[in-house]
Amino acid sequence: AADSFDYVRAQDVLEHVQDFFGVMEELHRVCRDGAEILVRMPFMSSLHFATDPTHRRAGTSATFDYFDPTRPLGRYAYSPARFERVSFHYGRFYPGKVGKLFKLIDRVLVPYCERNATSYEHYFAYVYPMHDVTYTLRAIKR
């Protein structure tokens, strides 16, 4: 039913759907105004994105800016669905001893990359790749 949900979690889902805009419009329809949507999907330079043949798309810091009327890409209005992009965070993970070393480095570099996302994504995304990106969105209905 329309306007039914205050919270939706779409973890490792949207990269698989064929009709991305249709799914976003359906999310918008079933969410109440101000509902929080948590989305996780593979980052564009992730080996996990490229390895899985069922992945249709990957995310960047700006993937959901097309739905946010307060952001420059929102002017394209590809869809009537509107969401505020509240936040995004890159995710990296490595197992074992190498993972412990990377975790120390990541404490500094990941927040730096998030603060400088456009430059990072243009110049360094394939040098220092993230695995996924997580977004917090808020449904806008007014």
Where does each model-flagged region fall?
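Short catalytic micro-motifs in class I SAM-dependent methyltransferases
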Residues: 9-16
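S-adenosyl-L-methionine-dependent methyltransferase catalytic module, highlighting the catalytic core
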Residues: 18-22, 26-28, 36-142
